[in-house]
Amino acid sequence: MMRGLFSRRTALAAAVEYSLLLALGAAAPAAYAAEVKVMSTVALTPTLGELTPEYESGSGNKLTIIYNTIADLKKRIDAGETADLMILSRPVLDDLQTQGKVAQGSIVNVGRSYVAIGVRAGAPQPDISTAEKLKVALLAAKSISYADPAKGGASGVYFAKVLDRLGIADQMKSKTVLVPNAQAGELVANGEVEMGVAQASEIAAVPGTQVVGPLPGDLHIEMIFSVGIGSMSKDPAAAKSLIELLTSPTGAAVLKSKGMDPA
């Protein structure tokens, strides 16, 4: 009888142990999942927004993404903030690599975008095919919006110089709404301003807007956005797997659908 009782207890213990092993096995992917911190220019917001679910479900990792202007992100990194992955302009990443804040040899070009003019969907599209016609269109607009140069938005800094080159900076001040980050498209969509100036990808990402086109002639400027792995990354392999998705055919298709050309 004691032998039978012992056998039943042994079997019960084995069953409990097996159940625990199954439970631990099921929990293993979550236990070893990496949390990948990304510091990204707002220009990649639409692309990362669409790719995040695919990355997280495919890798089991979790993305934490901080979006801001390149200038503000650079300030934070210079002040000592770290990230697993940084998506910024190529010159800024090259500088951070020189400083030792981006891992050597990890920088990869992801996409190209250009500063564009946008209007509300369905609204007449102004002729901006030459510098002179752009000047006429800007002067005729009731209101425009672009990123505040003082906040470091790359498109805003550049467009302020364009207004100077066109000789209409003072004339445009009274009808210009300066915004932080990439909000010009939202003001256009809401009807708060007639015309917005931003990265084409930022305008295209806002429902209710349409991209008229890039700045014409020698006013045209194209920006290359690149990605690099932080030298202090806790999981470089997890960070690299996101780079691989961004540069894959799937990533390229998403970039293109968001108004950006694969690099």
Give the label of every model feature segment.
Residues 32-71, 75-79, 90-100, 108-113, ...:
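Exported/periplasmic ABC-transporter solute-binding proteins
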Residues 6-12, 16:
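N-terminal export leaders
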Residues 84-87:
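Periplasmic-binding protein-like
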Residues 19-21, 31:
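Cleavable N-terminal signal peptides
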